[in-house]
A protein has these predicted regions:
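Select subsegments of transmembrane alpha-helices in polytopic membrane proteins
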Residues: 73-80, 124
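Functional transmembrane core segments of multi-pass inner-membrane proteins
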Residues: 8, 98-99, 104-205, 248-263
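C-terminal ends of transmembrane helices
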Residues: 20-26, 61-69, 109-121, 161-173, ...
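Interfacial loop-to-transmembrane junctions
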Residues: 176-178, 211-237
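Conserved post-catalytic alpha-helical subdomain immediately downstream of the catalytic base
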Residues: 193-223
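Alpha-helical membrane-inserting segments
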Residues: 19, 23, 85, 89, ...
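Long, highly hydrophobic alpha-helical transmembrane signal-anchor segments
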Residues: 1-27, 122-124
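Membrane-proximal soluble regions of multi-pass membrane proteins
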Residues: 19-74, 227
């Protein structure tokens, strides 16, 4: 058990290194396969020992060995987070086929979080492809294809209707098309109950964190908040703690129905 956990954590670090490549290159419409990893300032190809996850960044003290330009701390952070997600996935799902699907989903959320945070875009290469992959996986694994299909419709259509109403009332967008596609992808992988949970939790995070940032920075209400970051966090929580979060959602709905005299 310990050996399997350590292997998965190490694998997560390696995968995290690749995710960093995706995070940097996808917004710039560059190939994620070629050229080999290189310094983005002096373009020198990295040696193998400069590509070891986390340790290379620490060894190089966060700077290129040749031009001494700074290497973003995002690189080891993404690698450590991915390693932790792989480790957590092992304890949550065991060595099962579902583990592979959940880890693929987690990797997509990490990349979307980082890209949306920095560039405020959610690449179709991930969201649209993720919708297809999530639905195909649901044909053989949880949540099942019916729940997945409903999740796609709820994740993509319901927020779109809310955003359209917001646009007509306020005169500017509250959510972008990328957010709808990302939520549809969440629905494809996790099914309709958990896409509801994801939507609710992400909205709460957006109000609390986004509102706090706007208040502290004193920016106008027209400032765009990268909502995809909140979706990613909420979706990962839903994926890894599906049982407790679904139960909490059902209790909240039941409490509301009781309060409203409908149950």
């Amino acid at each position: 058990m310990i050996a399997a956990a350590l292997i998965l954590f190490a694998l997560g670090l390696v995968v995290g290194s690749f995710l960093n490549v995706c995070i940097y290159r996808l917004p710039r419409e560059e190939s994620i396969a070629w050229p080999a990893s290189h310094c983005t300032t002096c373009n020198r190809t990295l040696r193998w020992y400069e590509n070891v996850p986390v340790f290379s960044w620490v060894f190089l003290r966060g700077r290129c060995a040749t031009c001494k330009s700074r290497i973003s701390a995002r690189y080891p952070i993404v690698e450590l987070i991915t390693g932790a997600l792989f480790l957590g996935g092992y304890f949550a799902f065991g060595l099962t086929p579902l583990l592979g699907v959940r880890l693929l989903f987690a990797c997509a959320m990490v990349v979307l979080f980082a890209i949306d945070l920095e560039h405020q875009i959610l690449p179709n290469e991930i969201t649209l492809t993720g919708i297809v992959i999530g639905f195909l996986c649901s044909l053989a694994l949880p949540p099942g294809w019916i729940s997945s299909l409903i999740g796609i419709l709820i994740g993509g259509l319901f927020p779109f209707l809310i955003a359209e109403a917001y646009l007509r009332i306020r005169g500017h967008e509250g959510m972008g098309m990328g957010d709808f596609k990302m939520l549809a992808m969440v629905g494809a992988f996790l099914g309709w109950p958990l896409v509801w949970v994801t939507l609710i939790v992400s909205c709460i995070l957006g109000i609390v964190i986004g509102g706090s940032v706007l208040l502290v920075s004193r920016r106008g209400m027209g400032t765009r908040i990268p909502f995809g970051t909140f979706i990613a966090v909420a979706a990962l929580a839903a994926a890894y703690a599906a049982g407790p979060m679904r139960q909490a959602y059902e209790r909240a709905v039941q409490a509301y129905l009781t309060w409203a005299g409908l149950a």
